[in-house]
Design a protein with these regions (language model features):
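Acidic/glycine-enriched edge-of-secondary-structure segments
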Residues: 50-60, 158-165
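Conserved, structured C-terminal
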Residues: 75-77, 82-385
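Short amphipathic beta-strand starts and helix->beta connectors
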Residues: 4-13, 58-68, 176-186, 316-319
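Acidic, proline/glycine-enriched N-terminal capping motif
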Residues: 1-55, 64
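Preference for short coil/turn "hinge" residues that link or interrupt alpha-helices
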Residues: 4, 10-11, 19-21, 51, ...
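Acidic active-site catalytic centers that drive phospho-/nucleotidyl reactions
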Residues: 19, 68, 198
Length: 385
């Protein structure tokens, strides 16, 4: 919408509004909904009360991550689930296959299956009618002020004022067109901001909600923000993205990504539990955040990354997974040998290793380009905000 740096700064200092309607949304309904999700996901769904949510993930029977997600408990028998857009078809097919006992969910005990199926609803499908939901994200220090400047009843206003992180409330606001907009408002987000909300709305009312929030946010310096700013914000915050810091070409697990606390081994069973635990009990890889030492330059370029990381002796110890320009310096994440994860540890990254032909030193000729390592420093895994 504007410059990525301006949108990034708006979220950190004021408020930004994101169109994330591409995210996948579904519902798990029925008296056995909690049992089903506890078997299918890594977190402990039964800990949730009405109006609470949790970060979680789907694993396959080999313990490989299929996707990460947020699970919201709307009622004891109704759970709202948000997944990555690029994985929705895969997730939907997998959950239906598990629900219908068309796949083996435990290689060591092939007889294990779902005994009490649930109802699965695709909330992106027009066939879901009034149940359809898409996501708009309102993030930044003034996000609550923007919401409270919208017209709503006293009950919803009071609920929003006291809403703790990861909880949600359902209600209505008056849209810019004068009609009511039904919402599920959760205090969640993927920008690293402590004040941030995701608003789930019927797609027919999404444009009205967008205009309503932009109008209410003018006094607070609101900016409409694109996905590039969302990416730079989550990188700065150290939040993993599927295919970059989760699974992907490096096969990164939640534990390696620093999100192992969301994997509840005390559950006697969830799909992939045994192989996941066996691998992660012995992994020697860990995700780190880093900052490039040089200021004012894009030392690392391109969106795919994969640049090799070496230690002070020149030994390859890892790979860059993401990087973004934040202010006047670059920050990123890399999967490295776990011995090099302490904050302050020096790293060296070869930014052009894949773009420059590699020769043996004795074959160098005048005019050849040689990739030089870029110094970087390990940061704390997650920033303190």
């Amino acid at each position: 919408y504007t410059r990525v740096s301006e949108e990034h700064q708006a979220v950190r200092e004021a408020v930004g509004l994101f169109d994330v309607a591409h995210m996948g949304t579904l519902e798990v309904v029925g008296p056995n909904a909690a049992d089903f999700l506890d078997a299918a996901t890594v977190n402990y769904v039964r800990w949730l009360e009405d109006g609470e949510s949790q970060y979680s993930a789907l694993l396959d029977p080999e313990g490989q991550i299929l996707d990460d997600m947020i699970v919201y408990r709307r009622a004891w028998d109704c759970y709202f689930v948000v997944v990555n857009a690029s994985n929705f078809d895969k997730d939907w097919a997998w959950l239906n296959a598990v629900n219908e006992n068309r796949v083996t969910i435990d290689a060591d005990r092939p007889w294990v299956e779902v005994t009490q199926p649930v109802t699965l609803r695709n909330l992106k499908d027009p066939a879901s009618g009034p149940h359809q939901r898409v996501d708009l994200a309102l993030q930044g220090p003034h996000a609550l002020h923007v919401l409270l400047d919208c017209e709503m009843d006293a009950e919803l206003r009071a609920a929003l004022r006291r809403l703790p992180r990861t909880s949600f409330v359902e209600g209505q606001i008056v849209g810019a067109d004068g009609d009511l907009v039904d919402l599920l408002i959760s205090r969640t987000g993927y920008t690293g901001e402590s004040i941030g909300y995701e608003l789930y709305v019927h797609p027919d009312r999404a444009v009205t909600l967008w205009r309503t929030l932009l109008s209410a946010g003018k006094a607070y310096g609101i900016l409409a923000c694109g996905l590039a700013a969302r990416d730079s914000l989550r990188i700065e915050a150290g939040l993993p993205l599927y295919e970059h810091e989760l699974d992907g070409p490096l096969g990164i697990s939640q534990t390696e990504a620093g999100f192992g606390a969301y994997v509840k081994y005390h559950k006697p069973f969830f799909v992939g539990r045994a192989p996941y635990k066996a691998y992660n009990d012995h992994t020697e890889r860990q995700l780190v955040r880093f900052a490039v030492d040089e200021r004012g330059a894009r030392a690392l370029r391109g969106g795919e990354h994969g640049e090799p990381v070496v230690n002070h002796r020149g030994n390859v110890i890892g790979t860059v997974t993401s990087c973004a320009l934040v202010g006047d310096h670059q920050v990123g994440m890399a999967l490295v040998d776990a011995r090099y994860t302490d904050p302050g540890t020096g790293l060296f990254i070869y930014p052009e290793a894949r773009r420059i032909a590699v020769k043996a030193p004795d074959a160098f000729e005048v005019g050849d380009r040689v990739a030089l390592p870029v110094p970087a420093t390990v940061l704390s895994r997650f920033p303190i905000r």
